[in-house]
Amino acid sequence: MSRPALRIAGIALASLAAFVPRPAGAEADHVIVLPPFLVEEQETKPWLNRPIWSHGEAGNIEILSACPEDETQLFIEGLRTQRMELGQIIPDEFLLHTALPTTFILFPQSLKSTMDADLTREWERLPAASAAHDRLRPLDDLRLTDPDSSYLFVILNDAKWKETKRGSEFIFSPSYLRFLLEARTPALPAWFCEGATHFYESILIPWDKNGFEPDPWLSKDAASVLHEDAFAPRPFLPLRELFIPALPAGRTEQYRHVWNAQAELFIRWALSGKVPGGRDRLWRFAAAAAVQPVTEELFKSCFGMDYDDARNALSDYLPQAVWEPLKGPSAPSSDIPPMALHDATPSEIHRIKGEWGRRVLSIVKEYNPEAVPIYSSQTRQLLQGSFDRGDRDPRLVASLALFRLDTENSNGARELLEASPAARSARPLAVLELASLRLAEALDAPSGSNARLSEGQASGILECVAASLGKKPAIEGAYVIAATVARHLGREPSDSERARLNEGAHLFPQNSELVFQSAAWDLRAGAVAEARRLIEMGLWEATNPSARLKLLDLEAVGPLGTGW
């Protein structure tokens, strides 16, 4: 019996609307929440007097819009402006960048009832709908993310949009900013992601004139006390506890509350002008903390003061922070020309709608599996139908292969990917899934001596891994596959193979097993210094006691145990 392939894909979900799954045993009349449903429709509607969909792609943004061109261009302008404004407090390299453009599907509020009616009609045809008497509520805005790309569905309020002439508040909402920070590799420290997100929540629009609201601290009452008495007692953590990679289990809710508030205060203090060059110092410190353990020496090299002095400075700044707004940096000038839009081709429409349908399928499977036939049928019609009509756009072929994997057709997925080098090149996720399929087959029938993988089997897998590397963001699964191959070969990894594994361990130090294996291979190869660096970072990041114990045991053996 063949073993299942290791799946790389993991859809990350975010929505402005509360995504309310139906609990097991829910009573009748429970509200069913389903993702936006995009049908394969005709390309024009006479009463609109225009093609339904327009398309544009520039830089790292792709647009498929059912909105009029002026609204679409206003959205794009707002999106670009917000990204530049955000860069004044958070550098662009701290945000997620993906190999593929971020795709936005824009839909006008005025046409939403038509889309919802399509979904309702399909839902009511299902036996489960009539039996359960469920009420349907389609979602509005939704973000779905694969390791190599993001798709966002945005409903534009036609009337409000023309009134405000400003970018959508959804685009860089605090939750979206948190996602962009936390999904970046190597991972930024938790205190930075938490503090920057909470600080961003205090932004006042337009922020270049109004800046940021005063620090909310622990509560309005706690802030009021400090406003009236700057010397009033306040809970404050030592900075060595603030800069840990993650809060340990067992901490009280009050401790977490103080930790979150102090992380925000630290970001605000660094950007307040109280520290000369504070913004650059903060960025330098956060970047360093993403790739090495945080020590007081590291902090001092960035801020020019030790932990005690910085803690005192933070505490002294707090009474001012809770009553005084923080001035925002000057907004950058924007002279980016409008994106070139054109009537979307059938290939573009089917590719983007089909990929959207593939992504929402995983959510529907988890929360409302009875609705899977609606989405799988529509997605198959969009992707397979377009393929059958001769469309060989590499991204569409890659999406079709991933859809086949998602619907338990691994043989069909592999057939597509093996036959289409262009599809493998178009999406890192697709070529990694092929690596996973080859690995599963090789482990099921190893052709090397002593039930080990042969060099030929390993080469076929690792060439797919190599094709995915060097693109943003790095995908953890690529290094996990490479490590699995190394474990099942009848030899030690070569220097170049170890370098690739070490790269993965440095990028994903939270993966204690990857760190452990890479450090062990380094030790056996005599690369003691590299093993030491990996173990130090692994111990800094490890939260699981057994994982820490394995790393400590490795540290105690061989050259590390006697040569430090």
Describe the residue ranges of each PLM region.
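Bacterial N-terminal signal peptides that target proteins for export
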Residues: M1-G10
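Acidic/His/Gly-enriched intrinsically disordered linker/tail segments
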Residues: N49, A129-L156, G167, R184-L341
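Residue at a conserved register position within TPR or TPR-like alpha-solenoid repeats
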Residues: Y200, R404, R438, A445, ...
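Canonical positions in the second alpha-helix
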Residues: G385-S386, A419-S420, A467-S468, E503-G504, ...
